[in-house]
Amino acid sequence: MFHNFHILSLSSYPILIFCSSLGFTSSLVVFFKNGIFGGLLFCLFSIFLVSFAWGKDIVMEGLSGYHNFFVMDGFKFGVLVFIFSEFMFFFGIFWTFFDAALVPAHDVGGVWSPIGMHLVNPFGVPLLNTIILLSSGVSVTWAHYSLLSNKGCANSLMLTCILAVYFTGIQLMEYKEASFSISDGIFGSIFYLSTGFHGVHVLFGGLFLFFNLLRLLMSHFNYNHHLGLEFAIIYWHFVDVVWLFLFVFVYWWSY
């Protein structure tokens, strides 16, 4: 039946996402305090698993014809609100960073970056990661325009997913070789908090793109109907922009 509103069925996914997110933040505090990592990984896996199951059900609703243009407009608004909430999250992190950097405390020597910190050279691994992430932005845009032109875009979308995995691997290598930890003062805390949460967003965005790649291979998209892929692309560009700010201020300016 045609209608101009979205009829929601009963679903356990919102409460499951809530519980997983609450567990993630709680286990993050436990990890910072006691170094116990298992709960953090379990809750993160739970978030990904519930998100995948929820997304699968939404896809099945769309393929069954339940999503008209009014419903899709609601999805668009929801994604914009979600992106705005993510923006405010990173805005809070950058607020903390600039509060510490522009008015350094006496216990860090009154200068920024703190005295005695051996920072990561921004023109080494961070610059390489910047090139990788910007290249992934180009490849995902290429995939989008190829689809709009009614051409194949699976290769460029696959390339984007590979670059996401490459970025994550290099980021983990950087953490392993860094000479400071999250416990080394305000800079160490902000550095690992900002880049770590960005890394989680890269992981989530890469899985989102891979999920849409599978849908593309199953012929769920065409040049006129690919809303899920557009959401993934918008999210990925947001991740790109956040990394540019991290590179310029947390890596380069602090160095």
Curated annotation (Swiss-Prot):
GO terms for molecular function: cytochrome-c oxidase activity. This is Cytochrome c oxidase subunit 3. One of its GO terms (cellular component) is mitochondrial inner membrane. The chain crosses the membrane at residues 12-32, 35-55, 77-97, 114-134, 153-173, 190-210, 231-251. Component of the cytochrome c oxidase (complex IV, CIV), a multisubunit enzyme composed of a catalytic core of 3 subunits and several supernumerary subunits. The complex exists as a monomer or a dimer and forms supercomplexes (SCs) in the inner mitochondrial membrane with ubiquinol-cytochrome c oxidoreductase (cytochrome b-c1 complex, complex III, CIII). The keyword Oxidoreductase does not apply. It is a multi-pass membrane protein. Component of the cytochrome c oxidase, the last enzyme in the mitochondrial electron transport chain which drives oxidative phosphorylation. The respiratory chain contains 3 multisubunit complexes succinate dehydrogenase (complex II, CII), ubiquinol-cytochrome c oxidoreductase (cytochrome b-c1 complex, complex III, CIII) and cytochrome c oxidase (complex IV, CIV), that cooperate to transfer electrons derived from NADH and succinate to molecular oxygen, creating an electrochemical gradient over the inner membrane that drives transmembrane transport and the ATP synthase. Keywords: Membrane, Mitochondrion, Mitochondrion inner membrane, Translocase, Transmembrane, Transmembrane helix. It catalyses: 4 Fe(II)-[cytochrome c] + O2 + 8 H(+)(in) = 4 Fe(III)-[cytochrome c] + 2 H2O + 4 H(+)(out). It is found in: Mitochondrion inner membrane. Its EC number is 7.1.1.9. PANTHER family: CYTOCHROME C OXIDASE SUBUNIT 3 (PTHR11403:SF7), CYTOCHROME C OXIDASE SUBUNIT III (PTHR11403). Pfam families: COX3. Belongs to the cytochrome c oxidase subunit 3 family. The keyword Protein biosynthesis does not apply. GO terms for biological process: mitochondrial electron transport, cytochrome c to oxygen.
